[in-house]
């Protein structure tokens, strides 16, 4: 008969954005380190943790449904994450939830787990945790979160009320985590935060230390150091501050990926003012032109909102005109949706749903045409591709221009001997609006 004690089991569900995924990874790493077993089925677990999203109404609904499912299948549920900042809203629907915490409340979550499912007598030989921690992404890429919160007060957003003001991680800690990930086999680091280009503003860009040398806490310094690790480094959620210009030469030199994810949101100065976003469209177009002159391989991704309160046909036409001139590579578009607690809800002249839908369709049709033309320019060229999946039909990867889950893919039909994480040279043979097809060189 075995004398090995049964490890307590925790079920876990993670909803929302990559930043939430990083929070989940941190909680799971601590649980595994303490000897808890993480299981895929709620009915096998001693307790379930639901890490929620509360950014838009559909995310709130998804989170509430996930909580309900966990309660039905298990009964012992702890809720954390962004929606946890609205405890009353959760308890109104699910009064039987045991405990509720807000986002990045790691220690509170663990304390609650210890209370309801006491910490096991940990045997390190039974529950080994890799040095880089538990990761919910494939082994070859990882999200690297550099800060929490945001100092902006965009009228459509409630993130600051949930995650607080900007709180930058010490640059030495960020770089140490990046190094551990690379040593564990990660080939691509995706730098994320609510506002990546504001990194270090809250600490007045104080000097930190890495490998015994002083390093300034700033996005540019961080990129310079990450470049030394010899892996792909991709920047997300980059607010268009002037100093963003300083990272473009690093991209041109091949030190970090020539990829910028800049959420511009709109192009009408009047709508941008209502959103409390920077509003110089001409300046932004000039910068895009300058960036491309310095780094011709640059891929630009952005997101936009159509149907924002007060948006007229003239405002929307300005947005379409901007798309035609900017010719962005990757674009996401959302129909404005009221978010509980957002100040934009109180703005006059709400746009009817059918108008939002019609504008969204026009926006997407134009951008699909632009995207198809941009990708067609790559046919006949050779590009580097990182492999994500391999099955009996071939391999699927991404180019330097493609972030996981949100951008396009590169299909290599018949290439069944590659492995996820391989970086290969590919000749592009075909393209559509979003994806490429090619063969190994």
UniProtKB/Swiss-Prot annotation:
Stored CDD domains: Radical_SAM (cd01335)
Reaction catalysis annotation: L-aspartate(89)-[ribosomal protein uS12]-hydrogen + (sulfur carrier)-SH + AH2 + 2 S-adenosyl-L-methionine = 3-methylsulfanyl-L-aspartate(89)-[ribosomal protein uS12]-hydrogen + (sulfur carrier)-H + 5'-deoxyadenosine + L-methionine + A + S-adenosyl-L-homocysteine + 2 H(+)
Keywords linked to the UniProt accession: 4Fe-4S, Cytoplasm, Iron, Iron-sulfur, Metal-binding, S-adenosyl-L-methionine, Transferase
Subcellular location: Cytoplasm
TRAM domain segment(s): 376-441
Gene Ontology terms, MF aspect: 4 iron, 4 sulfur cluster binding; aspartic acid methylthiotransferase activity; metal ion binding; protein methylthiotransferase activity
Cofactor comment: Binds 2 [4Fe-4S] clusters. One cluster is coordinated with 3 cysteines and an exchangeable S-adenosyl-L-methionine.
GO cellular component: cytosol
Positions annotated to bind [4Fe-4S] cluster 1: 17, 53, 82
InterPro entries xrefs: Elp3/MiaA/NifB-like_rSAM, Methylthiotransferase, Methylthiotransferase_CS, Methylthiotransferase_N, Methylthiotransferase_N_sf, NA-bd_OB-fold, Ribosomal_uS12_MeSTrfase_RimO, rSAM
PANTHER family in the record: RIBOSOMAL PROTEIN S12 METHYLTHIOTRANSFERASE RIMO (PTHR43837), RIBOSOMAL PROTEIN US12 METHYLTHIOTRANSFERASE RIMO (PTHR43837:SF1)
Protein's name in the database: Ribosomal protein uS12 methylthiotransferase RimO
Source species: Cronobacter sakazakii (strain ATCC BAA-894)
